[in-house]
Amino acid sequence: MNDFYNLLIKSDKITTSDEWDALYNGFPVVIALSTDELEDSFAKLNNADGYGYIATWRKNLFAFNPKLLSKRCGLIDENANLLKAARIPKK
């Protein structure tokens, strides 16, 4: 996870967080390095009302269907490139 995190934190869009793995433009990020970790990542994001982002390796996109992700949950890669936008309500 250190290699992934070190790549992710280099992005200007990512900041550190004590509560989450990181923050993407102020929203929670949970890292899922494999498809086996996706379920746990969803559970963690439910603590943020389900709104946030899952960060995964770009190569994992072939292993699962991003359309199966909740609309409240976005997807970013190891370089913090947006792969699927989260539908976050306006405040």
Language model region names:
Residues 59-91:
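Domain-level recognition of nuclease-like catalytic cores that cleave nucleotide substrates
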Residues 18-45, 52:
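Conserved catalytic cores of phosphodiester-cleaving nucleases, focusing on short active-site segments
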Residues 7, 45-48, 67:
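Alpha-helix C-cap/termination motif
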Residues 54-58:
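Short beta-strand/turn micro-motifs composed of small residues
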Residues 48-51, 71:
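Short glycine-/polar-rich loops that comprise or flank the Walker A/P-loop
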Residues 9-13, 28-35, 85-87:
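Short low-complexity stretches enriched in small and charged residues
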Residues 1-25:
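Acidic-basic catalytic patches of nuclease active cores, encompassing PD-(D/E)XK
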